[in-house]
UniProtKB/Swiss-Prot annotation:
Top-level taxon of origin: Archaea
Name of this protein: UPF0284 protein TV0153
SUPFAM superfamilies in the cross-refs: Nicotinate mononucleotide:5,6-dimethylbenzimidazole phosphoribosyltransferase (CobT) (SSF52733)
Similarity-based family: Belongs to the UPF0284 family.
Transmembrane regions: none
Listed InterPro entries: Nict_dMeBzImd_PRibTrfase, Nict_dMeBzImd_PRibTrfase_arc, Nict_dMeBzImd_PRibTrfase_sf
PANTHER family: PTHR38811, UPF0284 PROTEIN SLL1500 (PTHR38811:SF1)
GO molecular function, a single term: nicotinate-nucleotide-dimethylbenzimidazole phosphoribosyltransferase activity
Species annotation: Thermoplasma volcanium (strain ATCC 51530 / DSM 4299 / JCM 9571 / NBRC 15438 / GSS1)
Length: 338
């Protein structure tokens, strides 16, 4: 499989619809409303709704809380469309978890009672860290040993900014990726600096509470309870940050990460800096031949990753679906949104 690049220790998966579950942890961070910080919505205000609508696309195959799917300001569609098409193609089961919804999706989800994460430049990001971790622990116990492979994915607009702030707080000065073609690094840096002036916290869990988001905390809780199954963190530099934190806090084994080539080649150094390269599987997707222009834009540095898109592609390829069949399923599914 030339379109899957495995690290030295990441080619270890046996995948089928019975032994694998896809868990989407979706939630809002008020960071996403800062102008220029993310393209995960047509306007900063609409980014608050993206996690709920992404969840509806994954759960129902359509938008119920909005006429249209989440789009970038340029009109490029949410990666949830890609992920849902692949999950439908492979028949892999999914679970949606409330990681701090601003608006509740109109599809079944695991209710954690979590509220949106705050902008850390203004106040503590996670109001009840223990509750978020505890919710994750319960979910982890439910899944552990039932499935051989547990994919943890996210829909958190602004999450590369919270990831950057958390890493910087614990002494890792590395750039995260972005859903935008041009990374708004100066804005991320300003938010981190304002957050540190408000309160400086250098411990891993303390940094998650002060500068992170609920998705991070729920993921850490899930991992702490999973002893028998493999976990694949499905995502880009957000989930790389979670995996690194998981090592520091939980010290778990059988943990891997899968992302798209668009993220990996944008921020290759982050994965090596965090010591994750050996446990990484890169989905080197090629959208240049997609039927619809909105999808072709992915090939040129827009969006890059989200809702576990890279991990979903990995699962399909491991199940011996040809790349062209995967691309066709995405094109066909996107038709209904046009």
């Amino acid at each position: 499989m030339e379109d899957i690049i495995f690290g030295k220790r990441s080619n270890v998966f046996d995948v089928n619809p019975e032994n694998t579950v896809f868990v989407l942890i979706a939630g809002t961070s008020e960071v996403s409303t800062v102008p220029g910080i993310t393209s995960a919505g047509a306007t900063p205000e609409l980014t608050r709704l993206t996690p709920a609508i992404d969840s509806e696309i994954i759960g129902e195959g359509k938008c119920l809380s909005s006429k249209d799917p989440p789009m970038t300001p340029e009109g490029i569609p949410t990666p949830a469309i890609v992920t849902k098409a692949i999950l439908s193609l492979t028949n892999i089961r999914y679970i949606i978890v409330n990681g701090g919804f601003y608006a509740k999706p109109k599809t079944p989800f695991i209710e954690t009672g979590l509220k949106p994460s705050n902008n850390p430049a203004v106040k503590t990001a996670i109001e009840d860290l223990d509750a978020a971790i505890h919710a994750g622990e319960h979910i982890g116990r439910l899944l552990d040993g039932v499935f051989e492979n547990i994919i943890l994915a996210e829909s958190v607009p602004g999450g590369t900014t919270t990831a950057y702030a958390v890493l910087k707080a614990i002494g890792i000065n590395a750039k995260t990726s972005s859903s935008m073609k041009e990374d708004p690094f100066s804005i991320k840096e300003k938010i981190a600096e304002m957050s540190f002036r408000r309160k400086l916290e250098k411990s891993p869990l303390g940094a998650v509470k002060e500068y992170g988001d609920n998705m991070m905390a729920v993921s850490l809780g899930i991992s702490s309870s999973v002893k028998r199954s493999k976990i694949i963190f499905g995502g880009g530099t957000q989930m790389a940050t979670v995996m690194y934190l998981d090592r520091l806090i939980n010290g778990m084994r059988d943990r891997y990460i899968s992302t798209t080539g668009w993220v990996y080649y944008h921020r290759t150094e982050l994965f090596s800096d965090l010591g994750l390269s050996d446990y990484l599987a890169v989905s080197a997707m090629d959208f240049s031949g997609m039927k619809h222009p909105g999808l072709r834009y992915y090939q040129y540095g827009h969006v890059r990753e989200g809702t576990g898109m890279g991990a979903a592609f990995l699962l399909a390829r491991l199940m011996n679906f040809e790349a062209e069949a995967i691309y066709k399923s995405v094109d066909d599914f996107y038709e209904q949104f046009i």
